[in-house]
Structures are given as structure tokens and as C-alpha cells.
């Protein structure tokens, strides 16, 4: 689990004396690490009774051509580049900003698959 509360260190490097401990709502969750395979989603309860859809696996993306504004569902072939982590390329993990090869051409992922539950991408030259 990840802790998403404030740091115990000040900007100067000194320790902050906290008046309380950690709280459960400050805990994070493990990342979804969406892979290229048959579509698999998972619904996760969030604060306020809401839900978040995690995309665990996907083999299609909604690819938009910026020249004509048309959006087409295209199969994903592979991950070409990922600025989030260089090891995600060989593991074919999709994150926002990753460059993928589709049947329409090379595209950059614009959605957050682990939080949105869908892969949206824009064609790049």
C-alpha cells in the first residue's frame, strides 16, 4: 500500500512533529498496470460511495485522428515507448502518455486506463 499523506520532513530537511498518526483514508492503492490482452475491468469502491473502474487488460483503444476529428476503435498491437517507466515497454503496460502501435498507426494514450477504465489515444505523426 502507498501512503499519500503529507511528508514527515520539512522543505529544509528537518522533521515535522505530527500531532496525529496515519489515517486509513490517506492510504493509496496499488496501480492497475494495464496490460495488452482481452478486456478485463474491475470496479473499485471509492470515497463518498462512488466507484472507479480499473482497466486491468485491454486490446483495443479509441483512437482519434486530429486532422479530421474522427474516432475509431482500433486494436492495440504493442507499446513502443512509455515515459512513466522504461521497463513498462517490454511488459506492454499502458499508462497515460505511453506511445502505442495500432492498426491506424502510432498513437499516444491520453486517458488514464487504471482510473478511467478505457484507453483513449490520439494519432501522432
Swiss-Prot record:
Q: Which family does it belong to?
A: Belongs to the eukaryotic ribosomal protein eS8 family.
Q: Which GO terms describe its cellular component?
A: cytosolic small ribosomal subunit
GO molecular function, a single term: structural constituent of ribosome
The protein's name is: Small ribosomal subunit protein eS8
**Which GO BP terms sit in this record?**
maturation of SSU-rRNA from tricistronic rRNA transcript (SSU-rRNA, 5.8S rRNA, LSU-rRNA); translation
Q: Which PANTHER family has this protein been placed in?
A: 40S RIBOSOMAL PROTEIN S8
Indicate the quaternary assembly: Part of the 30S ribosomal subunit.
CDD domains found in the cross-reference section: Ribosomal_S8e
Q: Which of UniProt's keywords are assigned here?
A: Ribonucleoprotein, Ribosomal protein
The record's HAMAP family line, in alphabetical order, gives: Ribosomal_eS8
Gene from which the chain derives:
rps8e
- From which residue to which does any coiled coil extend? none
Amino acid at each position: 500500500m502507498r501512503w499519500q499523506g503529507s511528508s514527515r520532513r520539512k522543505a529544509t530537511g528537518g522533521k515535522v512533529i505530527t500531532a496525529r498518526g496515519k489515517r486509513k483514508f490517506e492510504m493509496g492503492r496499488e496501480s492497475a498496470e494495464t496490460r495488452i490482452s482481452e478486456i478485463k475491468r474491475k470496479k473499485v469502491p471509492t470515497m463518498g460511495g462512488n466507484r472507479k473502474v480499473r482497466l486491468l487488460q485491454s486490446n483495443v483503444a479509441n483512437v482519434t485522428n486530429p486532422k479530421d476529428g474522427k474516432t475509431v476503435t482500433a486494436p492495440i498491437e504493442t507499446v513502443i515507448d512509455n515515459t512513466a517507466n522504461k521497463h513498462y515497454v517490454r511488459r506492454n503496460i499502458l499508462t497515460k502518455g505511453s506511445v502505442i502501435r495500432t492498426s491506424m498507426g502510432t498513437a499516444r494514450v491520453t486517458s488514464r486506463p487504471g482510473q478511467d477504465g478505457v484507453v483513449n489515444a490520439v494519432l501522432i505523426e
